[in-house]
Amino acid sequence: MGKLNNYYLQSYGCNVYVETGTGHGGTLGKAYQHFKRCYSVDIDQELVINAMNAYPNAKVGLGYSNDVLEKWLSSGEFSQEDRILFFLDAHFPGADYRGAAYTVEGEYAVPLQKELELIKKYRPNGRDFIICDDARIYMLGPFECGNVPDLQVKGGLAFLKDLYPFQNISINFYEQGYIEIDNRMV
């Protein structure tokens, strides 16, 4: 689970923060200080309730990231003028906090591709910045926390080429690795 330790969230020129994977709320707490509106989703009811209590002005949803993200994106919750910083961290639901298996198999195990497809569908002209953690489950490389060759998503990051221009995508090898997609200058 990434924590965006090496990121200055306020430096991206965004006014809205959306994360998938609330966890203990550490990253939400960091964002809560800098954004007009914050959104977070998790499948763990206890973690959601704790985040709602800690950050009463944030909108915290309970459910699978794809479902809640689509609800927010399709509802008119965000205008095209909004600049959103997305932090996509909902893979391996239940594994970090409730002992579920770390696996890349199953519909909800690694929702990154679907999450990015939803963002592209509902915000085709959005001037957003997207950070996705755990790049090391999509590729091998000089990751600070090492590689996980036994836990690789089939096809890796090939799906990105159909969603975003190559020049907007970069890989950061800090910690478990981050995929960064910069659409602010689209």
Where are these regions (language model features)?
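SAM cofactor-binding core of SAM-dependent methyltransferases
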Residues: 1-73
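Active-site flanking residues adjacent to catalytic metal/cofactor-binding acidic residues
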Residues: 18-20, 41, 63, 86-90, ...
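Short, glycine/charged-enriched secondary-structure capping and boundary segments
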Residues: 32-34, 53-56, 75-76, 99-103, ...
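Short, conserved active-site loop motifs that form the nucleotide-linked donor/cofactor pocket
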Residues: 58-59, 84, 128
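C-terminal substrate-binding/active-site "lid" region of AdoMet-derived donor-dependent transferases
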Residues: 92-186
